[in-house]
UniProtKB/Swiss-Prot annotation:
Any Pfam family hit: Cpn10
GO molecular function terms noted in the UniProt entry: ATP binding; metal ion binding; protein folding chaperone; protein-folding chaperone binding; unfolded protein binding
Name used for this protein in its record: Co-chaperonin GroES
Gene name in the database record: groES
Subcellular location: Cytoplasm
The keyword Chaperone is annotated on this UniProt entry: yes
Subunit structure, interactors included: Heptamer of 7 subunits arranged in a ring. Interacts with the chaperonin GroEL.
Record's GO cellular component terms: cytoplasm
Length: 105
């Protein structure tokens, strides 16, 4: 990807959630909500604090994150649908999600 976010911006790729319920019912595409989980694909250098010093971001490339339903701006970069959002729009990082993904590969 040839995109570098500025300041405290984060680029996130949505991660599709299960299209089947625990009971085995398949949810059609028209009834599914947009996923609120994603994988961080790029991060900015950070925001400037009150003292003018750069404050690095807590998230890093590869982190699996949860964000609000209406968070971010949808963009298309290199033909891929991505979200650009501020780090403050991210609610949290799913610990161990990235390592499980690598172990499965």
């Amino acid at each position: 990807m040839k995109f570098r976010p500025l300041h405290d911006r984060v680029v996130v790729r949505r991660v599709e959630e299960e299209s089947k319920t625990a009971g085995g019912i398949i949810i059609p595409d028209s009834a599914q909500e947009k996923p609120s989980q994603g994988e961080v694909v790029a991060v900015g250098p950070g925001a400037r604090g009150d003292d003018g010093k750069l404050v690095a971001l807590d998230v890093k490339v590869g982190d699996r994150v949860i964000f609000g339903k209406w968070s971010g701006t949808e963009v298309k970069i290199d033909g891929e649908e991505l979200l650009i959002m501020k780090e403050s729009d991210i609610m949290g990082v799913l610990e161990g999600a990235a390592s499980k993904k690598k172990a499965a590969a």
